[in-house]
């Protein structure tokens, strides 16, 4: 649907990129892999580069005093009736432009000049700084109204209205695609496709346990099956009779093994997140971990509402009910930027400003948390233990 931009969102390792690759041919799009170090101008520059432009710094400056860039692109012009034989010939013409990379009108003009018509995929959009995401949401409206260009934005979050919050003018101009939800039948279908490809069959009890232990994470299901195949000596398609796999293997133990390999990353997340951007009297980022580390896995799976977060924090924080709710809101809105500043990748938390809900967007973290001594984790970051 080129009439609207598209967002593909969901938790980490839930198949967002696979979905995009499945639906688009390589020639249908250009891919821009986002970086947490980019400004809006950097993002726009990378879009132009992937579209075929060569960029060099100009001697002229923008009205803000920043250097403009010279952009050049080669364009193939097909003409009919060559001198010999009357067949089609191709002439290469060069376009030379001077651009302000922070001006969306210049970017649209450059892409139109290059006769660019592919989809533009922005992968890992959540890695961009919050202010860059917000600024680009403003640009998206201009792309929608002043061009036929279509963006496909892929990121780790669970709020289908994330970009609309950044720019209300995008209402009705974005198609959100939720790639987070995998039900049991869909996970079974994933396993079955692998079984058919390898000419094997997993034992039913193994399949059921793998799905149950995965918390709905398709990567964990696939990795569990992969390790079961390795332990059974299956590294390629079985020739002849279909082979049974999983007999004598414990799917839950394999899942625990996969999660345990991430233990260092999850422990580092807790300690690094607790330290916040800097030391403050209220230590709000540390206290934001309190409702996470004291809630049940079921509660965390559904997401923690602002009301429940506030209730849990005020029940344990030294200032109690005198704590200003604005401090909690401010900490919640900084969830993503704090993780990026601490190089926590992939991110583990995301705050849904539409529904005022804090989500765990790394399902592996939920499984890991279910295996931990919560009081030990609380003690590690100086929070009161559960009674």
Task: Kindly label every feature range from the protein language model.
Residues 2-121, 127-134, 148-149, 323:
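P-loop NTPase nucleotide-binding core
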Residues 127-130, 142, 159:
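Residues immediately C-terminal
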Residues 139-150, 331-338:
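Substrate-engagement module of ASCE P-loop NTPases
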Residues 179-207, 215, 219-224:
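Conserved small helical "lid"/interfacial subdomain of P-loop NTPases
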Residues 246-387:
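C-terminal leucine-rich, beta-strand-based interaction scaffolds used for sensing/assembly
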